[in-house]
Amino acid sequence: SVESPSQKTSVQISLATNLLESARAEIAPDSHLSVYRLGIEPRGSQLVLTGDVDSVQARVQTLQRFKAAGIPLVDETVVLPASGLGDATWGICNISTGAGREKPSHTAEMGTQLLMGEVVRIFKRVDDSYLSWYLVQSSDGYICWLPPENVVRCTREQADAWTSKPLLIVTQFEAQVRSEPRADS
């Protein structure tokens, strides 16, 4: 029996999807600790690899698996951080406790918490019609989504300068931070 073009495409998609899931299990087994959000998309007679990864190595290893299996595809993966962020791919949590969400939604499960002053790596920004979110990696390695108002973006150098400064702990219920010393404070 001869396969029709749609049957052939369906078989290719199935093989490619299985190969991608196998690669994900080995390259990025814990989705809480690495970004490996890839998918297979059919476009005409071609298969397209789309999505995000957090390292060049993850992308290369994935592409090598497809090549070794003889499955041709068009690569449209993005290695994060996203180029649109410029040099400010780091951030500092600016609220007492930041709720790191599993998905970019306030109703999504909380995956981790960030403390004020904690430095995060910013991978990308997602905007919808009402809200924006950053995909970040916390200092303990967890990947989560934070609203932009919970993070002050900065460069790697600024983040390093921040972490090299002494830590101040305020034990009063109410305090004020002033830019200069005052005799009456």
Language-model segments: which ranges?
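N-terminus-biased targeting/localization segments
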Residues: S1-V2, D54
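Gly/Ser-centered flexible loop/linker motifs
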Residues: S4-G44
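Boundary regions of SH3-family modules and the immediately adjacent low-complexity/disordered segments
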Residues: S6, V60, Q64-L85, S105, ...
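Solvent-exposed, polar/charged alpha-helical surfaces in well-ordered, non-transmembrane soluble domains
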Residues: E21, V60, Q64, T112-L115
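Short glycine/threonine-rich beta-strand-turn micro-motifs
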Residues: L33-L63, S132
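Beta-loop motif signature
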Residues: C93-I122, V170-S185
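Short, conserved beta-turn/loop elements at beta-strand boundaries and strand-helix junctions
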Residues: K124-S132
